[in-house]
Amino acid sequence: MRELTLTTTVFQTTKSQEIFAAAQKLMPGGVSSPVRAFKSVGGQPIVFDHVKGAHIWDVDGNQYIDYVGSWGPAIVGHAHPEVIDALHAALEKGTSFGAPCLLENILAEMVIAAVPSVEMVRFVNSGTEACMAVLRLMRAYTQREKVIKFEGCYHGHADMFLVKAGSGVATLGLPDSPGVPKATTAATLTAPYNDLEAVSRLFEQYPNDIAGVILEPVVGNAGFIPPDAGFLEGLRELTKQYGALLVFDEVMTGFRIAYGGAQEKFGVTPDLTTLGKVIGGGLPVGAYGGRAEIMKMVAPAGPVYQAGTLSGNPLAMTAGIKTLEILSRPGSYEHLDRITGKLVQGLLDAAREFGHEVCGGHISGMFGLFFTAGPVTNYEQAKQSDLKKFAAFHRGMLEQGIYLAPSQFEAGFTSLAHTEADIERTIAAARTVLSQL
């Protein structure tokens, strides 16, 4: 096995720059997903070579403590030996069947047992795909067209969701995307996150037209923004009152902030749920599920069509099964909560010591830090952050061997592989950087 050691102590990125320069001639912006291009933090992106545990190495030999975790999936740590061994065994049987396999049943049973709202589940290949499918399903079930989403919440890059969206859309400062027909988004209503009165007004305006409300129960694609007390409960009451569906997009929070996701954490059960990231153990995956009476409308059981060549492929199912097995062991979420709490408090204390206005928080292994006094309870408040200061902080941390998400508008993640030493090293690095900003 490759020896995972620090190969250089001098931060230099010559090879990364060469590879990225070549990539820009081959792919739009040189990347396969916009946020990776470092547009909001400046400089050129780092090109990675290999990963292990809580650490990553780039092509120049620089080593980093990782708080991106492949944008969330690496919750048990990168290249976990049990996951790798399971994948090796699965590879011997083939990479894709395009037909039913037992592994789908096993992962489905695990998801249904864990997530309160899910009685039946359909596997797809990405979170975007899951949200596209669930939108079609909620409209078919209610026979209504309008849907409420929240400013700064991100539900993938499907046309109907690219209205005041988060994630890369927020990072690039785009109000929406060219190429999206107005008719496609005409039925998409928006409200500020954590504003129950705004949602109530929309229902009063369209009492018989709204199919449902979809949201990230904890926002992670406009930075880390938790729900105010009573917000999720209020949405549940409003949707029931008006005969609409409540959909939790738990692509990010599912199995991340609790084994049963945000709905377990907050005790609010939606009608439908979308999942991704963690349930694929680092391989491409998505899923949507909910009440059986609704899910039975999905083809071939019902008339709502959705399909996928690689859906339920054995490699993603294998990685997901093993990842959930590891997560279900005693102490997993206690570890995530402890180390993430220590990390966030250390970052906040360091920033304030050196005179920077910051706010932030965490839930289990999901966290965020804004360069504004706060509080931040919605996307508009998140946009008050000092983006230039964040960019300088990000670059400084990178040079100190700490890899943070290259955008103020993305949540951070810890893993079971992060140690107390990793956290202490990160806080020490932050003190060095913050003292110089």
From Swiss-Prot:
Modification N6-(pyridoxal phosphate)lysine occurs at: K277
Quaternary state and interactors: Homodimer.
UniProt xrefs under HAMAP family: HemL_aminotrans_3
Protein name (Swiss-Prot/TrEMBL): Glutamate-1-semialdehyde 2,1-aminomutase
Organism: Thermosynechococcus vestitus (strain NIES-2133 / IAM M-273 / BP-1)
Lineage: Bacteria, Bacillati, Cyanobacteriota, Cyanophyceae, Acaryochloridales
Record's subcellular location: Cytoplasm
Entry keywords, A to Z: Chlorophyll biosynthesis, Cytoplasm, Isomerase, Porphyrin biosynthesis, Pyridoxal phosphate
One annotated Gene Ontology cellular component of this protein: cytoplasm
SUPFAM superfamilies linked: PLP-dependent transferases
